[in-house]
Amino acid sequence: MKEYQVYLERARSRQQDFLYPLIFREYIYGLAYSQNFKRSSFVENLGYDSKYSLLIVKRLISRMYQQNHLIISANDSNKNPFWGYNKNFNSQIISEGFAIVVEIPFFLQSGSSLKESEIIKSYKNLRSIHSVFPFLEDKFTYLNYVSDIRIPYPIHLEILVQILRYWVKDAPFFHLLRLFVYNFCNWNSFITTKKSIYTFSKSNPRLFLFLYNFYVWEYESIFLFLRNKSSHLRLKSFSVFFERIFFYAKREHLVEVFAKDFPYTLKFFKDPLIHYVRYQGKSILASRNAPILMNKWKHYFLHLWQCFFDVWSQPGTIKINQLSQHSFQLLGYFSNVRLNRSVVRSHMLQNTFLIEIVRKKLDIIVPIIPLIRSLAKGKFCNVLGHPISKPVWADSSDLDIIDRFLRICRNLSHYYNGSSKKKSLYQIKYILRLSCIKTLACKHKSTVRAFLKRSGSEELLEEFFTEEEEILSFIFPRDSSTLQRLHRNRINRIWYLDILFSNDLVNHE
């Protein structure tokens, strides 16, 4: 405990980050304006009144300190003269300035703790969202239980601001930040409606994303500390997680929650074969030991969210299942551990034995029903999966229509090429192919059969099923044994480590 306390005392000396003067620097808002100006959705019909001016920003900030503007509710913000005629533009410029300023100390801190070569190496290894699946294939086959965790959403913006105060000691900056977010929720009430947080997240996406990610990072840092402490692992690689002002207060609160016996509690948590993966607003905790240990972690997570972050979470948000009997959703896939049983005949002297061998394999399949729902939402088929035409695209040329459908099909094929079974993927391709043909026939005011017979587009539309082989031919030489083996064995999976984000059709979770 003393060595941690000495370390925290040194860490506090690095927390003298004075961000308040940066709020009045012109280059901060100039940078925010230049970034927003590049977004087409933000600069449409801005007009002369939307031009950036540091004088306007300073006037808005000075008005935020006036007492008569502290009783404004979110419903009256549109009529409030504080924001002037361009409330959305001015508030977003200030929000972008806040986001840029608050990111500076954490960027400098992470950059100073890592060497340039380590940053480049970590970026290359973790830039793809599919990099988690090879890890799961190596680790999850040895595990038995999995907890599907839904991270609770913060009910009040004050929680997000308060977490940030644990890291940066600058009272004027946080006072100004509170005054700014006051326009979007009523700070006098403890519970804020989801509509207020939703409005704030849409109006200030960069600032809200930073605050929310920091909220998730904060609870994960405490979890990582307990996990490493219980497994007797070295903590040097996680030194950045300990730089908090109220770290010991949190730790003492954990002692109270778990019967005032911190070392005894850690013995319950001791599990070297436990793995944690977070994606979007969910996370997965997998272990090899008995369910009692998973229930201990579930109990810990619920108390952590309620006691530290004032976020109420129902026990149903954490579901504990056996990997061999239940599947879990991960980044648009359905995954489970399948038992492969095989019988081997062994002959010893004059006796013959039958030995049953059980092997575990991580099965990752394409979720056909959620994908059909996504296609139906995009007007490519109905809810039953029957392809329909896309009349919205009928004004484009034939090549543009085919190129649009091919682009969607290639993206889905590229994303789901690591699945164990390709049958569902071929069904999705078939739906897109018929939807493309019906769209072309609708454009030419003809039937599908008459259009195909007249235009002879069957060979062109075969690209819906041949682009996978073309991609593999670019990766491997055509006469290579690896490519021939992949063609012979269709069940092999290939994970492309260049996928930075998921397709909108994949985002059905």
From Swiss-Prot:
Its main location: plastid. Usually encoded in the trnK tRNA gene intron. Probably assists in splicing its own and other chloroplast group II introns. Signal peptide: none annotated. PANTHER family: MATURASE K. This is Maturase K. InterPro entries: Domain_X, Maturase_MatK, Maturase_MatK_N. Pfam families: Intron_maturas2 (PF01348), MatK_N (PF01824). One of its GO terms (molecular function) is RNA binding. It is found in: Plastid, Chloroplast. Transmembrane segments: none annotated. The keyword RNA-binding applies. GO terms for cellular component: chloroplast. The lineage of its organism: Eukaryota, Viridiplantae, Streptophyta, Embryophyta, Tracheophyta.
